[in-house]
């Protein structure tokens, strides 16, 4: 039976499965997530996510602020890494690992510490106790069967993004649809067979939404315009494929968006190339990618009045340098006189403000780490003993206190500097321990007095102090006189013989100006060539030279060999010669660097008067040799070189072999800041190499910052020069686009009108023929209607005649009827009169 122990190094496939499972199941179902990984438990999966795979975890380099905060919190909350981690912004394992690394760096200064004895380093055969916080192992090309099976099962389970409940609902929905279709088919077949199996409606307590419309509002009776309502019903499109049901995948959507971006960029580049280039430059700008930190400038430490005094002193020294009469004299005379244009003597405070704010004493992070390491290694107070020596620290808050950075004031620095033997000596004060010098803190900025013209003449109350002052003055005078150089030149006065008078004086011919200029130019060139031959081979061949800043390092490296040797054993002639060569080399380097400085930026900005003053005051005097002596020395050096080649067996070596050997030696040289000298890297230790690489990295970083400032300055300058052209280009480009758009619209209209013309020409003949046929038909119709109209007029006239006859007959009949009525009335009237007469007679 095979027993599987869960754990071990995480692999790339396991990380990918874990990330996909967290995306599906969330960060609470670790048991279900661990079921996808055969070799990992739920606890290990959770630890892997929160220690490495979580996107919120910072995996960048630790900053100085984070280190300070970590050490401060470790001092306040020891071993409480889960409390410290969210404050620092890292995981607990990262905080613990960084804390131990800082303690190791602090312990490297201990002589008894050995990095090979670190118990945290894994030895061959040991198992990593915390593999969840380490990078994943790459997948092998040929995975075993267990890994393939695990991968396929995880792919199958993770592909089911809808879940079991959604599948069950879909299956029930399909069964219900099949049941309904079967019932409908059954009713249709029974109806076709003549069997009326009516479906009885079940009575519902509430509203039957299948038969009734809830909250229906019927339209009022009447006639209304339904033109807007007579619209064709939109055909509802239901999803029929799996892609339509599930929707578009995220990968397809992203690919489509990328294509749209590419097409949009192409259109933008084609239509508005300057704007597209400007947008690309903005995206590639390092200021956008890298968030610049806030510039913290210290408050000014020098007042305007003090700056004016410094400027006046520099202006006075420039006026003295411009005076040619003061700079005349030989090298010996200049060596005896003091130079007031140089920096004040050693021990005095410089007048210039430093270029940058000096750093604090030591590294604060290393100091805190050393404190914690000493506290960790200290014994319990129950055993007694001395307390460990700790650096100054504070427990004032949760986070370390920020230190205010200030630029030192050179005008106020002397008054703040404690007294010591290295400061400006003042007579009559407390003597130092060795009794050789007296020192105090100056009250203000000391004035330079190299010739002791303004020497203090204060008398001390104590006779002992006055005696010591006089002895000090005598000792300084005696040491100054012993340091005078030996006389180098012997002066001899030779009387020149009187010139012989020629019997026939030659006529003086006035020289032409062009000939004079050519002669002076030739003489100057000859003089320059003669001076060039007397210079060193480095200057003659224009070879690279060490800068002035590295002369101190070269001096220490050249003179360090003499300091290591014992003074008891007398030096050999070869050692004496080697020492003389090194001293001559150092003197020649300083002379060339002072008289022929490198053309760097600082030298270019300075004027010619500053260079003249420097060459006259700072150039060291060296021996002046004739050209013959120099040629003889070159000859001797060549002979010595040939002798060395023969004696060392290098006569058959080619120039390429010497170049290769020289390059090997040069590449092996490295500057070690711990020793302040150049030495061979092959024989140096790891700590020295690390310090050398750190120094080189710091120099490269400073160079990058300078280049970045140059680039920003050039960019601003470029914008200043091209802003108007860019605006003009944008205006012209807008006009061009408008013109092109109008031309495109005009071309489209022309094509449309041409097409209309062709269509009109084709349809004109057809319409003309149709119109002619319609005219003919209209004429025939009008002729028929005219004929019918004439017939109708005849019928109307005939009818009118008939009506006139009928009307005459009617009038005649009416007259006859009236006559008959009149006769009847007359008869009636006659009969009434007779009746009245009879009645009267009867009454009588």
UniProtKB/Swiss-Prot annotation:
Pfam families: Myb_Cef, Myb_DNA-bind_6. Residues 30-53, 81-103 bind DNA. Residues 500-513 have a biased composition (Acidic residues). Residues 145-189, 685-723 form a coiled coil. Belongs to the CEF1 family. Component of the multiprotein assembly MOS4-associated complex (MAC) at least composed of MOS4, CDC5, PRL1 and PRP19. Interacts with PRL1, MOS4 and PRP19A. Associated with the spliceosome. Component of the MAC complex that probably regulates defense responses through transcriptional control and thereby is essential for plant innate immunity. Possesses a sequence specific DNA sequence 'CTCAGCG' binding activity. Involved in mRNA splicing and cell cycle control. May also play a role in the response to DNA damage. This is Cell division cycle 5-like protein. It comes from Arabidopsis thaliana. The lineage of its organism: Eukaryota, Viridiplantae, Streptophyta, Embryophyta, Tracheophyta. The gene is CDC5.
